Amino acid sequence: MKLSALSLAFAIILMMTIMYTKADADASADAEADADAEAEAFWGALLAAAIPAITSAIQGK
């Protein structure tokens, strides 16, 4: 009886560890994707503002 209770406790701890690790990995992946999207949006906006200024400077306006 003690062995089955110990096995059950071990199985519960193992499953909780696996679920926590998976949730942590998913959260990290989501945060990384958000950071990448934010960086792309920043550089896109910067280029959109810089290109007209660069072309104006080249044309001497």
Curated annotation (Swiss-Prot):
Record keywords: Amidation, Antimicrobial, Secreted, Signal
Key word Membrane present: no
One GO term describing the cellular component: extracellular region
Processing and modification events after translation: Truncated sequences of this peptide have also been found in the venom. It is possible they have been cleaved in the venom.
Family, similarity comment: Belongs to the formicidae venom precursor-01 superfamily.
UniProt keyword annotation of Secreted present: yes
Pfam families tied to this protein: Pilosulin
Species, as recorded: Odontomachus monticola (Trap-jaw ant)
Organ and tissue specificity: Expressed by the venom gland.
Protein name, UniProt field: U-poneritoxin(01)-Om5b
Protein's cellular compartments: Secreted
Positions of post-translational Glutamine amide modification: Q59
Classification lineage: Eukaryota, Metazoa, Ecdysozoa, Arthropoda, Hexapoda
